[in-house]
């Protein structure tokens, strides 16, 4: 029986781009090549409106599993390539149909004749191909409105593609076309989702995590490393900056009125993150804030916190409720890591009654009583930076190194 030899990738949103589309296509091709590193026989051809992945014997299911997490891919189809002869097309359509998994009762045929000199018209091809499937299967009927399977035939000069297994991609834009941002990665449910949604818009991310030993444990730190590792499924790598925050928090607890300690803490985080962003050539800061979720996420709080940075602050979750955020976290694989019961620095010295409508004037007045600059400098200087990659890529590189 014929087997799938190709995967045809459709771009989706990238097709709206104009003169710079080639940059988007090139970046997507590079990201796909990186994602499929463990499949040495694969060949990739990226055209202006579609990508063709030639499997050359590689497992199409394993390849498909990795493709679904690549941003910039709208949909993709497993495909067979056959000569553009009627009998070959009929046999290819039947073979593709028989390989569809699940409870299939109905189908339809869709034909696109890119090669206009093919001797049969579309309306002549439909009954020929559909009839061949009906003759060689049982308990199957045609449903042109809501079929279980759509057998798609693309006829070209010399060869045709047969497709019926259509799968959804991650959508969005290829990571890397939209610059870089710094993501505040707390270890909770929200911030990894914010990182994911930022990457979906084609933006590379680096993560900043604030930890406060001995008030926060090594297990809490490892949780954040694991979250960053999980996010590498959707990009080439995630650079994680672990910032020691103990002295800053102790000083805030001592010098700032408790009602404003949360606000000032967030302002210090923004200042430190901006410094790291300048070092790393990032263009914005992303947070996992959702409007009204906690005291530090009211409009008044965000207005006061934003004052200390000139960088754009991206808040992808701003209008989502918690259940919507949890749903995405479960889908992308970060939820089970986020709910591990380890504390983070935001729970250290939590005030009993934080201000929900903090004023910039008050925050500035409280901060002016103590020079936080040396503490900020120290936190930036003592940060620990690590680069995380997909586990499989790391394993392949280690395997390569062992040869020498």
From Swiss-Prot:
PANTHER family: TRNA SULFURTRANSFERASE
Taxonomy, superkingdom: Bacteria
UniProt-listed InterPro entries: Rossmann-like_a/b/a_fold (IPR014729), ThiI_AANH (IPR020536), ThiI_fer (IPR054173), ThiI_N (IPR049961), THUMP_dom (IPR004114), THUMP_ThiI (IPR049962), tRNA_STrfase (IPR003720), tRNA_sulfurtransferase_ThiI (IPR050102)
Binding site for ATP: 184-185, 209-210, 266, 288, 297
Name of this chain's protein: Probable tRNA sulfurtransferase
Function field: Catalyzes the ATP-dependent transfer of a sulfur to tRNA to produce 4-thiouridine in position 8 of tRNAs, which functions as a near-UV photosensor. Also catalyzes the transfer of sulfur to the sulfur carrier protein ThiS, forming ThiS-thiocarboxylate. This is a step in the synthesis of thiazole, in the thiamine biosynthesis pathway. The sulfur is donated as persulfide by IscS.
THUMP domain mapped to chain residues: 61-166
Disulfide pairings: none
Pathway field: Cofactor biosynthesis; thiamine diphosphate biosynthesis
Family: Belongs to the ThiI family.
GO molecular function: ATP binding; CCA tRNA nucleotidyltransferase activity; tRNA binding; tRNA-uracil-4 sulfurtransferase activity
Main location: cytoplasm
Catalyzed reactions: [ThiI sulfur-carrier protein]-S-sulfanyl-L-cysteine + a uridine in tRNA + 2 reduced [2Fe-2S]-[ferredoxin] + ATP + H(+) = [ThiI sulfur-carrier protein]-L-cysteine + a 4-thiouridine in tRNA + 2 oxidized [2Fe-2S]-[ferredoxin] + AMP + diphosphate; [ThiS sulfur-carrier protein]-C-terminal Gly-Gly-AMP + S-sulfanyl-L-cysteinyl-[cysteine desulfurase] + AH2 = [ThiS sulfur-carrier protein]-C-terminal-Gly-aminoethanethioate + L-cysteinyl-[cysteine desulfurase] + A + AMP + 2 H(+)
Native species: Bacillus cereus (strain B4264)
GO aspect biological process, one term: thiamine diphosphate biosynthetic process
Compartments, as annotated in UniProt: Cytoplasm
EC id: 2.8.1.4
Keywords annotated in UniProt: ATP-binding, Cytoplasm, Nucleotide-binding, RNA-binding, Thiamine biosynthesis, Transferase, tRNA-binding
């Amino acid at each position: 029986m014929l087997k799938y030899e190709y995967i045809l990738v459709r771009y989706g949103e990238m097709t709206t781009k104009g003169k710079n589309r080639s940059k988007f296509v090139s970046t997507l091709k590079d990201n796909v090549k990186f994602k499929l590193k463990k499949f040495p026989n694969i060949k990739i051809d990226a055209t202006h409106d579609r990508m063709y992945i030639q499997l050359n014997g590689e497992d199409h299911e394993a390849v498909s599993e990795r493709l679904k997490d690549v941003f910039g891919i709208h949909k993709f189809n497993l495909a067979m390539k056959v000569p553009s002869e009627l009998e070959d097309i009929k046999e290819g359509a039947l073979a593709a149909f028989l390989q569809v998994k699940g409870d299939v009762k109905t189908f339809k045929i869709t034909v696109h004749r890119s090669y206009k000199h093919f001797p049969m018209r579309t309306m002549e091809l439909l009954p020929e191909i559909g009839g061949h499937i009906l003759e060689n299967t049982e308990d199957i009927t045609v449903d042109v409105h809501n079929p279980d399977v759509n057998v798609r035939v693309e006829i070209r000069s010399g060869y045709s593609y047969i497709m019926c297994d259509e799968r959804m991609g991650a959508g969005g834009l290829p990571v890397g076309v939209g610059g870089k941002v710094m993501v505040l990665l707390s270890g909770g449910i929200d911030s990894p989702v914010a990182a994911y949604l930022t990457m979906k818009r084609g933006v590379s991310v680096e993560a900043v995590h604030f930890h406060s030993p001995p008030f926060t444990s090594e297990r809490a730190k490892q949780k954040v490393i694991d979250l960053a590792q999980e996010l590498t499924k959707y990009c080439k790598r995630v650079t994680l900056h672990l910032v020691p925050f103990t002295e800053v928090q102790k000083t805030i607890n001592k010098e700032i009125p408790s009602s404003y300690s949360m606000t000032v803490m967030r302002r210090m985080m923004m200042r430190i993150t901006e410094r790291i962003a300048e070092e790393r050539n990032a263009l914005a800061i992303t947070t996992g804030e959702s409007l009204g979720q906690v005291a530090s996420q009211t409009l008044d709080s965000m207005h006061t916190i934003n004052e200390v940075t000139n960088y754009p602050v991206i808040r992808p979750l701003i209008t989502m409720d918690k259940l919507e955020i949890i749903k995405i976290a479960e889908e992308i694989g970060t939820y089970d890591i986020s709910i591990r019961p380890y504390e983070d620095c935001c729970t250290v010295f939590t005030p009993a009654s934080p201000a929900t409508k903090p004023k910039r004037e008050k925050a500035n007045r409280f901060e002016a009583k103590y020079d936080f600059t040396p503490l900020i400098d120290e936190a930036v200087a003592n940060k620990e930076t690590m680069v995380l990659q997909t586990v499989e890529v790391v394993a392949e590189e280690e395997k390569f190194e062992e040869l020498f």
